[in-house]
Every structure is written in structure tokens, then in C-alpha cells.
């Protein structure tokens, strides 16, 4: 007695097609019964710390004040520009803050009082302090990260509460 099966091409296609049809029929039933993962599965939401930067009355026009935010390895600067700007806070809506790390290669920028820009000495990128850190010229492809400030009229305190944009060299601003 021989244990071999004589299968023709036509027979093979019929058996294979039947198997595919059964799998296609059962697949939606199995996926309907599968447990759905929550929409935010695998995501972690980290809160920015609230850190007092300065008191508004202590800031002088075009005199940058250094601080670190959201942690001690992130140098930032707050500047009173002297005229109201979009996103500005304080009694005259003229106080802004930025990370000083250039978004191109992470070199520290410096504030230029005459042009109200942040200039990177490494590759000559310039960022406009009056226009939300917008890149004016140079190698960077992103604006300078803006530190979000909250102003409390009662205490005149300026508090950093977040960052708009990714600080150079990070996958997330809060670590």
C-alpha cells in the first residue's frame, strides 16, 4: 500500500483556496473579540515643573536674565523687550524667555540688544526674540524653543510653566 497522495495543480489550488476562504471568514470574528488597547497606551504624559524665573519689576529693558528650565541642564534667558510682543507676559506684555541652545547643533546663543535677536556663533544662525524665536537666517531648521511664562499680577512673579518647541539634543523636554 502506498502512502503518497497524488495532488494535481487544480487540486492544490482548490484546497489552498478553501483554506484562505475559511481564514478570511474567521479573521473578523477573532479581531472583534480581541481586547482593544487604550488610545494612549504606551504614552507617558510628563508635567512641566513650575519654576519662578524672576520678578517683573527686577527686569530691565534688553538686559537678559539667565535661568535653567525645565531642569538644571537646560540654559535659558528671559528678556524684557520694551514693547508688547505676541506671547509676551508681564505688565506690558513685553517679557519673553527662550532656551539658549541653538536648534541646529546645540551651540549656546547670545542675545544681541541692538537687533533683539539671539545669535549663534557656531554657524551664524539668528533667531528673532520679538517673533517667538523665529529663525531669521542660518543653518537651523527650527525656531528657538520658547519658554512659556505665567505672570502673577499680585506678586509680580514670572514663572516658567512649559516649553514650546523641542530643546536641542532631547527626545522630550521633560526627563
From Swiss-Prot:
CDD domains from the UniProt entry: Rieske_ArOX_small
Signal peptide positions (record): 1-32
Cysteine disulfide partners in this protein: 107-122
An example Gene Ontology molecular-function term: 2 iron, 2 sulfur cluster binding
PTM: Predicted to be exported by the Tat system. The position of the signal peptide cleavage has not been experimentally proven.
Keyword Oxidoreductase appears in the UniProt entry: yes
Cofactor note as given: Binds 1 [2Fe-2S] cluster per subunit.
Keywords on record: 2Fe-2S, Disulfide bond, Iron, Iron-sulfur, Metal-binding, Oxidoreductase, Signal
Needed co-factor(s): [2Fe-2S] cluster
Catalytic activity field: 2 oxidized [azurin] + arsenite + H2O = 2 reduced [azurin] + arsenate + 3 H(+)
Domain Rieske: 62-158
NCBIfam families reported in the protein's UniProt record: arsenite_ox_S, TAT_signal_seq
PANTHER family: CYTOCHROME B-C1 COMPLEX SUBUNIT RIESKE, MITOCHONDRIAL (PTHR10134)
Family statement drawn from the similarity comment of this UniProt entry: Belongs to the AOX family.
Role this protein plays: Involved in the detoxification of arsenic. Oxidizes As(III)O3(3-) (arsenite) to the somewhat less toxic As(V)O4(3-) (arsenate).
Name of the protein this chain belongs to: Arsenite oxidase subunit AioB
Species this chain originates from: Alcaligenes faecalis
